[in-house]
Amino acid sequence: MTGVVYAFPWNAPRSAIASSYLTYDQQHRRDRMFAALLHARKVLFLQPECVRFDVYRTAAVLEQNQGSQRANAFLISFCKKALPRLELVAKKYECSGINSNVSAAVFDGHFDTQLMQYLASRMVNMVARFNRLPDMSRADIDLLAADIANFIRAELADIDDTGFSELKTLYTWYMRAGFISLQFNVTPPKWERVTKKYFCEDEIAPAVMRMFNEVWWRGRLRRIAAAWREHLQIAVGNVSKKRHAYASKNCVTDWREQKRRTREFLKGLDLEDEEGNRISLIEKYDGSVANPAIRRCELMARIRGFENICNELGYVGEFYTLTAPSKYHATTKAGYRNSKWNGASPSDTQSYLTGLWARIRAKLHREEIRIFGIRVAEPHHDGTPHWHMLMFMLPEDVERVRLIIRDYAWEEDHYELRSDKAKKARFHAEAIDPEKGSATGYVAKYISKNIDGYALDGETDDESGELLKETAPAVSAWAARWHIRQFQFIGGAPVTVYRELRRMADPETARALSVEFAAVHDAAHYGRWADYVNAQGGPFVRRDDLQVRTLYEPRTEFNQYGEETVCIKGVYDASIGAGSPILTRLTQWKIVPKRAVDLAVDVKGASAPSRSSVNNCTGSESDPPILDLTKPLSRRERRELTNRLRKKKPTTRRKFIHGTDKQNVAITKTIDEIHSDNRHHNQPGRSPAPDGRW
């Protein structure tokens, strides 16, 4: 069919200039989208800056690459899915208002006087600032800590304790300060003992001093702020296998920076004894269990010793894995948001696992089943902890131990354990097969993975898919942020005595004390953990039945809260008594700043001092080392370059040199006239004359 031919071109029909009208359904859909977008922007504005920054940045990238419609859809979807999760986190940290206990104790339940209104305004101001902790800098947090401490101090000074005994006065002070502390989600020291009326003056007085101490509040608020920020990152999904496994990027950065600052601080300090002899503090630090390599070696030696004891006693090894129910996990195994999450933090999950194990241990004790071993706490990709346990027991107790642990592990939220896969995820047991490897080999990977990634080159993580060598810092940052104890031995002898005996390098003195003491010392001296545990009484020895114990003595000085502190002085044989100890710490050391000469020598790459007493050459501070910018800079070179750029050069002022005595007289006269004019100007009622003079 041919087209219609018109006589003139303008006779042909043309398309409409305006678009067709929207249908009612399209209009309602558009209005709902606008309303949802406005609501999303409104609620997002109320969230902490650490959350808004990432969301706005992602929306800006989407708008630039895919258009504004895609960015708006992202904002609406984010607020719909993530806002309930953020509200769960906020309920755990925010202060919704002034508690009734604080209102009754501080304001007497009324605000009709000017003083009460002033106190209420201060309290409201501090509560509002507390709710902004995730976005506050360290200086702002320290300022809030000082304000809270001063507020509590003023409240305690205002209490009328006339006619009170000393104990009643301390109790009144404690309860008033405790209510204010609870207002800011900080549990007062000794709170459970004091509320149960099971305390003495020596315990309650230091607790009161802590609650009006600025330094104490500073540490509590910093810890809350750090946990709050990390919990928000978990809620929005930034801690997962899709973003950053185990810990957020800022958490790992803060951990690295804290480690660097700690080392820089220790490098400037020395240990000095009574005679003035000095040793480097950083060298002693690196030679202790604070060094990850030494810590890992000690853990491996201890677990190897437990395995030797297991073989001697005819025990068998079992490897268990305990995982919390799904409501404790923020994201799924695939990295998506878990709709069952109840807002639990990693510390909440660790508390659940600790309570679960306490019930299991009590059940085993009631049935007289004895086990010993080690448990390792490590995170899932979303930061939720789970436990790996290597336990040794009698062969006839294996099935009963498995049954007890399984029943307690499956008890909570058992309705979700409908498949074998779900049951295995909650609790998994595996017998140690000597043909496949030793018991130590089962946990060696977990120990190295959670410390420094030693001997794991090329191996990848099962959850995140990243190299284990690269995920080790994230795991350490996770444990430090949530204050989770990664390794704990169950059974055996205390490691403190073991370390003190290794400091003692005199076997003759040990043999002179007793044969039993010498056996314990020799085992510790040569690093034989199995022999040490057996010499102390075996893997199930009670603390009251130890052969060798640690000797503690009180210090001569008290701490800043008036408490008596104790320190380790040595060890003693329990059969002989603490009256005949062996002192392992004879020298009293104190931490002092390094000498200026030592600091100059310790600077790596610094210029050597001149041979003469006068150095006329330009110092290294004016001539910094030239960096080779043709190749990538190392981390240390980048930091030095940044510090050099930030450093301000001191402004040098030229000293005015007066010419002659006549000029000096003129200058002095001018200064006197200026002072005279200022005095006249400051007099009340003075007005300027027509010529401008006062």
Swiss-Prot record:
Residues 644-657 have a biased composition (Basic residues). GO terms for biological process: DNA replication; viral DNA genome replication. The keyword Hydrolase applies. It is an enzyme of class 3 (hydrolase). It comes from the Viruses. InterPro entries: Replication_gene_A-like. The active site is at residues 442, 446. Residues 609-621 have a biased composition (Polar residues). One of its GO terms (molecular function) is endonuclease activity. Keywords: Covalent protein-DNA linkage, DNA replication, Early protein, Endonuclease, Hydrolase, Nuclease, Viral DNA replication. Residues 634-643 have a biased composition (Basic and acidic residues). Residues 605-659, 672-694 are annotated as: Disordered. Its EC number is 3.1.-.-. Belongs to the phage GPA family. Endonuclease which induces a single-strand cut at or near ori. May act by forming a covalent link to the 5'side of the nick. This is Replication gene A protein.
